[in-house]
Amino acid sequence: MPDDQREPYPFLPDVPRHVQIADVLRQRIRDGKLTPRMPIPSEPHLTEEFGVARDTARKAVAILREQGYVHTVRGMGTFVRARAEWLIQ
């Protein structure tokens, strides 16, 4: 299927979308699909992947930051923290 005809992400109706996106990214981190020091997808990429507004993607990343899974370096991006760092948060 071409990228411009991608199936919409199957969001649950009773859970805010930013929470669901954070859950997906957190699972990718836990599964090792996103590894320490690796950048997570950019906000524009997340908006395209999940079909949401940029503010929704930003809120999802903020949840992960608050939980200690990622940290942001201004002008460089948002990166996965080492496992030991997110376990103690």
Model-assigned labels for residue ranges:
Residues M1-V52, K59-A62, E66-H71, M76, ...:
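Extreme N-terminal segment that seeds HTH/winged-HTH DNA-binding domains in transcriptional regulators
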